[in-house]
Amino acid sequence: MSETSCVNATVAVVGNPTSNKGKGAEVGKQVVELLQEAGRKHGFNVIDVTGESFDDSLANARNRRNEYDYLVAVGGDGMIALGANAVGCSGKPLGIVATGSGNDFARGLELPVNRVETAVDGIVGAIVRGTHIDVDMGLATSLQGGYAVDSSTGDDLVGDSDVPLRPAVNRFYAGMLSCGLDASINDRANHSRLPNGSVRYFVAAIVELTHMKRYGYHIKATLADGTVEERDIISPLLTVANSRHIGGGIEISPYSRFSDGLLDLVWLDHVPNVAECVDAVSHAYSGKILGCKVFGWKRVRDIEITRAQEGDEPPVLMADGEYVGRLPVKVVVQDRALRVLVPPAVAESQAANTEEKVLEAIKRDHRDPVTGKTDTCYAKRSR
């Protein structure tokens, strides 16, 4: 695509002005200025659709979608989720300036993390050259009895007369839907009065890990081969993953690919003992965590998650680090529904991450690619 293709195009910038004690607003302003400078050179216009809050910014990005051709989200995974919910399924490309604490989605795409000028340069280059990739998303919607919560606090929503509201969940996510331990850690950290974000998360993780609960889930999933599996899962951890990373780089779902038309269901088979915890931690950043037998794994096209009769009450659901709602919920993969601006090198790297390479990793970890089970007999057959 020639450089003249972006002449008279409009690039919208959206950020979260309340993030990081107001520093998010400063970074957003910097991104706008950098894009305006590039726009004068390449002939595109820049508008800022940032609102006064996360929800206000999302509403602006949605309601003003006919005013722009590209949307640039500035912030962490939550802001990328905002961008996905603003332009998902529209064909309008999303640019990512990753400046959060986790940045797991950007990390999975090998985009710059906490390097604002480099990220903007990459976005401008992608706009000028027309380079992008189309990635999958998950769509979470409420089943009967499920409902959305306040996206900032996780609290139940109330009306003007303090009457509880029960709006349905209807939300795209780009990275992970967290239904267990990872959600409870985030929730505890968000409600902590400790001053430092890293300290809040560390303390919350220690508390939750040392008081691990056995949450009760009932799942009904359409697997990759089209068969339907229905069962209870009593587990501290249950995650429906579109991307590989969580928690600032932990590869909890190393077999995930952004454009395979599938989601990966990952859970703990049981409350792990000390040795199993050490084994999992030692493989957390190497892409080999699912080689640990304490984990369960399956590829799914869609999944219904409800409350099992046994087990503890699951925590509030979180997607990409933001509050979503309460069970029950249905999740369906949205095949290549989000267009993302990327440099040519990233597009080539993602294209090189083939299904064959993923199957090699699955076999390396002694798992059956169809059933997801760790099987000694299968391991011997695959050698």
Task: Label every PLM stretch briefly.
Residues 12, 36-40, 45, 49-51, ...:
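Catalytic core of DAGKc-family lipid kinases
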Residues 16, 77, 185, 238, ...:
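A residue-level signal for conserved active-site and pocket-lining positions in enzyme catalytic cores
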Residues 17, 74-76, 97-101:
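Glycine-rich beta-strand-to-loop/alpha-helix junction loops that act as flexible
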Residues 1-74, 81, 85, 121, ...:
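ATP/NTP phosphate-donor binding region
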Residues 25-27, 83-87, 107-109, 251-252:
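Short amphipathic alpha-helical segments
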Residues 178, 182, 237-255, 322-323:
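Glycine-rich phosphate/pyrophosphate-binding beta-alpha loops
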Residues 3-6, 24, 221-232, 251-383:
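ATP/nucleoside-binding phosphotransfer catalytic cores, i.e., glycine-rich phosphate-binding loops
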Residues 18-19, 101, 181, 244-245, ...:
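Short, glycine/serine-rich, charged loops/turns that create anion-binding
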